[in-house]
Amino acid sequence: IKNVKGNESYTVDADGNLVWNADGSDIYYQGTAENSELPVGMQITYKLDGEEVSPKDIVGKSGKLEMTIKYSNASKKQVTVAGEKKDIYTPFLMATGMILPVDKFDNIDIDNGKVLSEGENNIVIAYGMPGLSESLDLKNVDLGDDVDVDTDELNDKITDSVKITADVKDFSMSQTYTVATADL
């Protein structure tokens, strides 16, 4: 592992993790680590008129599109909470952006995100927080009668998946861009 934009060095802790002394600054490095599993991931699935289709088979097709983005989080630690061992995930926010031309995509709807139009294109921003719902375990939280919070509604907003629907003509899609951050 080589620092490519500074002089900061790292040490290896008892668990084999690299620890950088960066004083809050970003570190830019290159190299290969023994454990190459990424902390987060994503998968996009497509349905056209209710039938699941592969990305290569949907190109050029028309119909009712349902695109599902499923984010995943492999970064977790086991901690003790109220005397019980629980898996707590690193709280990542993941956001995906895509540009969908108005001449191919119409009636776009998204359950976790926003659709913005600039005339020729719809800009879709989707978000998810993989692992956060499991870490908070809101289904098993009793807030009492004095707290007026719908935990099911809150749980729906901190989901790890996004569903985008649209009427599509001659399907084609350029790149999607996804960013994950635990630094909010």
PLM region descriptions:
Residues 1-184:
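Cytosol-facing boundaries of transmembrane alpha helices in integral membrane proteins
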